[in-house]
């Protein structure tokens, strides 16, 4: 009910499977590969799929233009920069990050806190957060095919339900400020002994 109310408030389709990207809208975030994946999906677009892009950046206008040429252009929503990211996450069904380079993604951690299964590229620290096939999917970077296949899997009810159940069980406390502080202290203590 809360998700439905948020979708009405944010003017999002009520019965869609909403995948969300939150972040800078730039090519280094892999969004040109996402556009190519959407072109691949255009012929066999999952009927319930809607993608929500939240953020601004130097690729935004080009991305909007390329998506406008899709047959399913109305199913790709650009929300621009938003202050209340949590509302958009809570209104969505899964999180998407096709990034080409990543350290430890705050966006992915926020998506996990919102209990969203994640479709992310296997780069940087993403594997510390997402376990492939358990609480989401890890896909190869630079691959429109992998992104398209991952989106299809997120639209599959049984796969999605498994990820959703597991993301709710995953403990992300190891990424809390307190835990990170403890880890840094132990590194500093070790370095002082050298």
Q: Which residues fall in each region the model found?
A:
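A short helix/loop element that forms part of the nucleotide-sugar donor recognition site in Leloir-type
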Residues: 1-12, 165
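A short, well-ordered alpha-helix in the C-terminal region of glycosyltransferases
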Residues: 8, 159-174, 186
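A conserved mid-protein helix/loop that constitutes part of the nucleotide-sugar donor-binding site
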Residues: 17-40, 58-64, 145
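Aromatic "clamp/platform" in nucleotide-sugar-dependent glycosyltransferases that forms part
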Residues: 81, 100
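Short hydrophobic beta-strand element within catalytic cores of glycosyltransferases
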Residues: 117-120
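Conserved acidic donor-binding segment of nucleotide-sugar-dependent glycosyltransferases
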Residues: 132-133, 137-144, 153-158
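C-terminal alpha-helical cap of glycosyltransferases
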Residues: 176-194
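Nucleotide-activated donor-binding/catalytic signature segment of Leloir-type glycosyltransferases, i.e.
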Residues: 64-80
